[in-house]
A protein has these predicted regions:
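Short catalytic helix/loop segments, enriched in acidic residues and glycine
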Residues: 43-60
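Short, surface-exposed acidic-centric catalytic microdomains
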Residues: 65-86
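Short Gly/Thr/Asp-enriched flexible loops that form oxyanion-binding sites at enzyme active sites
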Residues: 126-156
């Protein structure tokens, strides 16, 4: 039987293969989050996780819409004013309207970003140009609303609806962090497939290796995707790719839960339960139950599952992205 050490080495190879299969992995980011002094007050909002940890695995493409629109640093603070659907970017003290300058910059910058094939984007929370949600918008009479989005972020999401986006503040939540980074790597794999050509056979293989990951997010939509694969002959390749890609990313955006992870782990257990001894099966069921009751993080049952996958040479399970959706060095599943 294969030792735990051999199992660990194989896991390292799988972790490396995630990177080689998806490189280059480019992510957009608000420039201030990298420590550049581009904020209105001349300061920055450097994020250590993004720069020191995730930065080892991605190539950052930094953008500061306000600076690139020619507004300078430091500059007068600005806010969004008017109709929440079509707000204007206005300086707080002098009331100067910079909307047109930012819109021109946005149009030009989005055209540049399209050619860079981004796999995700991290925006600055609350920014009138970069906030994704709950950005403050004021009526003409000064009444405050928090239902807005930054002008640049909103335009980016409209033009690139499949690209995973998140705000740096929300990435402090371990579950949201793991979900975002998982989606980034999945989207990169999807981009690779699209670029190589989406044949029916290639799409079926892509779906197969992502099946358990999809089950952890939304079992019903995983079934819908499976039916789409089964009816691939009814669709033109381009239409099939578009429909699958949209639903694939929509499914992954649904938050995985402990209950759904337990369901997936039990599916995996069922794959080789007849080959497990009584004590081995009891041990695996025990760690799954501990995870279910919040006594251990997800990494604990997964580690034991991976060990048995290697021992029994379960190639179908080994190929599942669910086991290694992102580099283990990020330790994302140590906290969920």
């Amino acid at each position: 039987m294969e030792s735990l050490r051999d199992s660990h080495l194989c896991e390292q190879e799988q972790s490396r293969s995630i990177m080689t299969a998806t490189a280059p992995l480019r992510l957009g980011i608000s420039r201030c989050l990298l420590g550049e002094e581009v904020r209105f007050d001349g300061g920055h909002k450097r994020d250590n996780f993004l720069t020191e940890v995730l930065g080892r695995y991605v190539e950052w493409v930094s953008v500061c819409p306000e600076v690139e629109a020619g507004l300078g640093t430091p500059r007068e603070a600005m806010r969004l004013v008017g109709d929440p659907q079509y707000p204007r970017l206005v300086t707080i003290r002098t009331g100067i309207d910079h909307t047109r300058a930012l819109e021109t910059m946005t149009t030009n910058r989005l055209a540049e970003l399209k050619s860079l094939d981004l796999s995700g984007y991290v925006f600055k929370k609350g920014s009138p140009s970069c906030g994704i949600e709950r950005v403050r918008i004021f009526s003409e009479q000064g009444k405050l609303s928090r239902n807005g989005a930054g002008l640049f972020a909103r335009a980016f999401i409209e033009q690139f609806p499949l690209i995973p986006v998140e705000e740096e503040g929300r990435l402090c939540d371990p579950t949201l962090r793991e979900n975002f980074i998982e989606r980034v790597f999945c989207y990169r794999r999807w981009q690779d497939l699209v670029q190589s050509g989406v044949t029916k056979q290639a799409l079926a293989q892509f779906h197969t290796i992502h099946k358990y990951l999809l089950l952890a997010h939304h079992p019903q939509q995983c079934e819908v995707l499976g039916r789409l694969i089964g009816q691939a002959h009814l669709h033109r390749p381009k239409e099939l790719a578009q429909r699958y890609g949209e639903l694939f990313m929509k499914t992954l955006a649904v938050k995985a839960t402990v209950r759904k992870h337990v369901n997936v782990l039990q599916h995996i257990l069922g794959y080789f339960k007849k080959r497990l001894g009584i004590h081995e099966k009891a041990e695996l069921l025990g760690v799954i139950d501990d995870y279910h009751h919040g006594l251990t993080p997800l990494i604990v049952p997964l580690t034991l599952v991976k060990h048995y996958v290697q021992i029994f040479d379960a190639s179908y399970i080994r190929a599942q992205v669910y086991l290694n959706p992102h580099p283990k060095e990020l330790m994302l599943r140590n906290h969920v």
